[in-house]
Amino acid sequence: MTISPPESGEKNKKVLEDPVKADPRPIDFAKLDKPGFWSTKLSKGPKTTTWIWNLHADAHDFDVHTGDAEEATRKIFSAHFGHLAIIFIWMSAAFFHGARFSNYTGWLADPTNVKPGAQQVWAVVGQEMLNGNLGADYNGIQISSGIFHMWRAWGITNESELMALAIGAVIMAALMLHGGIYHYHKAAPKLEWFQNIESMLNHHIAGLVGLGSLAWAGHCIHIGAPTAALLDAIDAGSPLVINGQKIATIADMPMPHQLCDPQIIGQIFPGLASGVGNFFSLNWFAFSDFLTFKGGLNPVTGSLWMTDIAHHHLAFGVIAIIGGHLYRTNYGIGSSMKEILEAHQGDPILFPAPKGHQGLFEFMAESRHAQLSVNLACLGSLSILISHHMYAMPPYPYIATDYMTVLGLFTHHMWIGALFIVGAGAHAGIAMVRDYDPAKHIDNVLDRILKARDALISHLNWVCMWLGFHSFGLYIHNDTMRALGRPQDMFSDNAIQLQPIFAQWVQSIQASAVGTSILAGTPEGLPQKALSEVFNGSLVEVGGKVAISPIQLGTADLMIHHIHAFQIHVTVLILLKGVLYARSSRLIPDKASLGFRFPCDGPGRGGTCQVSSWDHVFLALFWMYNCISIVIFHFSWKMQSDVWGLTGGNFSQSAITINGWLRDFLWAQSSQVLTSYGEAISMYGLMFLGAHFIWAFSLMFLFSGRGYWQELFESIVWAHNKLKVAPTIQPRALSITQGRAVGVAHFLLGGIATTWAFFHARLFGLG
């Protein structure tokens, strides 16, 4: 920790004393009638059909609107409020549907037999077929978002609470919209305020994350945990008694405000009624009934203990509040990000960068694309971590036995994470083209990496080839041996074993930690329940269904794991090449002057098409799609086979050949979606078909060249001219970049929606 010099303190003081500019841009509704008002070229209106494409491409590219960093940053800040408003409206709609149309209370009363339903479909021309029997006399559309399980964890027990939340969310949406307008038109922050990094870290880490987590811990302690205790007791068949009344049904539950009464709450958690005296006298053991470290899963609900979750959020909130105060803001004490960065020098032998991290602070503070790139990479990785924790440590009651919800949440968080990581590559490329000044980065680590880019990319290329040939070669070998009737020569758990010994070692290390006192800090050591059951734990059943069990790994897992590794490395190769060669390459030394996206590099330099940083993102999206498809296929089949007991444990012997994947996974498990017509899941059959069409539509844009379409349009325009019905807006074929963008968008949408229908019909169809 260091004391900042007086002039630095003064500078910070000025920023925080006068952080905003009043009335920088009066509200002008007339602009809304003029599409493309932010561009002199587009605001003139369309002459060709290219206008509509440029309108879409540049509407959110704030850099090109004004070229002013302060103005662009204000727009981003204002857009955040708009984004939050949309989220609140979306949440309000979910709450409203839950309150008015769903079977939430029916599910809450019998969560192991009743299925979650969103609404009942009106009978217009036979649509009532979609209303499946979900139990408890409710016919409607089954959902798999996990929203019911989440509401139960929050402590919501009736429709009026959901309606109150719906109204509250709409009010919050209005406040957010007002905030966006206010902070752009009436009181817009100055550029210095946005670039006051330490204050931003203080506000985000201590304020938003720390206090937010602490506030949520308060809700979990006072509402969530007591409600969970009462509901769990009902579901276990041994209801609790409050004030002499047995809480036997949902109707008997106390209202949330009643749970804040010490006299009532003391009958559930005596520690909650003991007052704050124990806190200030450091007798924190008195709170151990509602702030627990039980570990493992609640045997009634198959989910983490609500009191453990409350304890987690309390601890995390305190850590974040302390962590948010590590940085130097008003008082001259604390760490400076610039000083921390510049104190790190490159290794003189392994990574010679004489100027170390000099210039990096300014680049990260001033480049919005660089910031977004790092944030997307971190958040994407976090989303992928979440997807794995959702099944290994199920947080919400009864979610672990709702198999479609488990699979849906895994798939959702994998797609989101992967898209964010590709976005990180995209914005890193934009940052290199638009925000990177080579003169300010001589002999620092960024410059050093750019100088070493040929070695980095060629080595990564070699790794990809090695992984690809070897991992795919194992499958080719197995398919060949099976076709020749030589099972003894196959790679399998029964013949030539390729056991994932490192993964098994990681699993056993987790299990071997049980009983050690070093990690737990207690004489009796780390309890068995402190580990996820997937690490050599025990099977947990809820309502006759497997909630979680140990996940054994074998040859089939090692083989598909190396396919995952291959695809991840190729995706990274493409993205990294797009970033490192965004400004220049041997083929096109002046890429930086051509911009982030350009189709071809003009006449005279043949073979220079499709080399822009944008084109690398385009290609990476296909590899990302294939990569995540195999990941979710692996998860779906592995869980159905080895955990949920739906396919008779066929994964280990069928997943070791390509034919096995095609026959026993794709073909065998698609029977539900292909035979869904006439059933409640028939919409997934239609979605499966329609999404295939969307996917096939994309190939029209990806396989054909721009010239083909332009010639087609010209002949159609000629025919119109002959009939004197020529349009005033001249038809133009999409540019190469536009065509590729339309192609990849439909490819991803079609592919993802096809998988969506396949998964849902499979698990809903099995009941």
Curated annotation (Swiss-Prot):
Divinyl chlorophyll a binds at residues 700, 708. It comes from the Bacteria. Its main location: membrane. Residues 1-22 are annotated as: Disordered. It is found in: Cellular thylakoid membrane. It is an enzyme of class 1 (oxidoreductase). Its EC number is 1.97.1.12. Divinylchlorophyll a' binds at residue 692. [4Fe-4S] cluster binds at residues 600, 609. Pfam families: PsaA_PsaB. Phylloquinone binds at residue 709. NCBIfam families: psaA. This is Photosystem I P700 chlorophyll a apoprotein A1. It comes from Prochlorococcus marinus (strain MIT 9312).
